[in-house]
């Protein structure tokens, strides 16, 4: 099976490739080979090529979903429409969505993800896997779970800017969902990549604080509870490692 991953240098794309390259023929072109903002680049890349699955992770604005820069909306839609222009070159498309579709729909990033998901529903064999938060040892050092595991390892206070309910999924479990969609048929058009049980940032910090035989203080920058960032789980009949085991795995790899 031949799979194209767009946005090949990104965190999710690299994680998919590292996990599945032995099972599938995975193509992860750099921007010099496939620039989704340039139709000439797309024409050249797709010439005489066909893929069983395209996993669309390429996106602008993901590092700051509140960014008001309207070019984020423009370029995200340009990339997706350019990809659509080559739909005869692939059988299935898996779009990596975002919780920002639901919780930040008035931002250029959230609005673009919302429009893309609506377009997904217009095509057979197009699907959205909506990610709220994803983590493992390879995520950016500033991300909530990894940053606080590192603080715990260094015996430093953990930091919670503002407590909230938030859905995180361990990267290996996200890969399991992606592979389910790679191989599956008669699939839901969109699913939230979340666990059945909701978790607060405070609860996640408490899990980290129980990783060894000592505890560290937890510092709150704001003691009020913020808006939740969660989705309804789907029943995909997948056995997950789960949030707690994912945190344990990250700790064991970082310590």
Give the location of each predicted region:
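Conserved Rossmann-fold NAD(P)-dependent oxidoreductase catalytic core, especially the SDR/UDP-sugar
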Residues: 60, 81-110, 127
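Adenosine-cofactor binding site in Rossmann-like domains, unifying the SAM/SAH pocket
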Residues: 25-44
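SDR active-site strand-loop-helix element
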Residues: 6, 29, 54-58, 93-99, ...
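NAD(P)-dependent short-chain dehydrogenase/reductase
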Residues: 106-110, 114, 118-166, 171-176, ...
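NAD(P)H-binding glycine-rich loop region in Rossmannoid oxidoreductase-like domains
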Residues: 40-75, 100
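N-terminal Rossmann NAD(P)H-binding glycine-rich loop of SDR-like oxidoreductase domains
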Residues: 2-22
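NAD(P)-cofactor binding segment of oxidoreductase domains
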Residues: 66-93, 114, 118-119
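C-terminal substrate-binding subdomain of Rossmann-fold SDR/epimerase-dehydratase oxidoreductases
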Residues: 156, 160-255
């Amino acid at each position: 099976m031949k799979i194209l991953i767009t946005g090949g240098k990104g965190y999710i794309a690299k994680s998919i490739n590292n996990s599945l390259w032995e099972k599938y023929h995975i193509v992860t072109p750099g921007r010099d080979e496939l620039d989704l903002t340039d139709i000439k680049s797309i024409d050249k890349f797709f010439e005489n090529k066909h893929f069983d699955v395209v996993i669309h992770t390429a996106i602008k604005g993901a590092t700051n979903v509140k960014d008001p820069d309207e070019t984020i909306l423009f370029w995200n839609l340009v990339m997706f429409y350019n990809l659509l222009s080559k739909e005869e070159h692939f059988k299935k498309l898996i779009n990596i969505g975002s919780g920002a579709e639901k919780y930040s729909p008035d931002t250029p990033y959230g609005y673009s993800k919302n429009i893309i998901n609506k377009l997904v529903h217009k095509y057979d064999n197009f699907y959205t896997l909506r990610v709220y938060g994803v983590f493992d040892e390879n995520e950016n050092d500033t991300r909530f779970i990894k940053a606080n595991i590192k603080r715990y390892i260094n015996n430093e206070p953990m930091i919670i800017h503002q407590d909230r309910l938030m859905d995180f999924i361990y990267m290996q479990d996200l890969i399991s969902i992606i592979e389910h969609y790679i191989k599956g048929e008669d699939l839901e058009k969109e699913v939230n990549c979340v666990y059945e049980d909701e978790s607060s940032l405070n609860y996640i910090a408490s899990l980290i604080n129980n990783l060894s035989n000592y505890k560290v203080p937890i510092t709150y920058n704001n003691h009020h509870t913020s808006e939740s960032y969660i989705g309804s789980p789907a029943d995909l009949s997948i056995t997950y490692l789960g949030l707690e085991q994912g945190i344990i795995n990250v700790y064991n790899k970082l310590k």
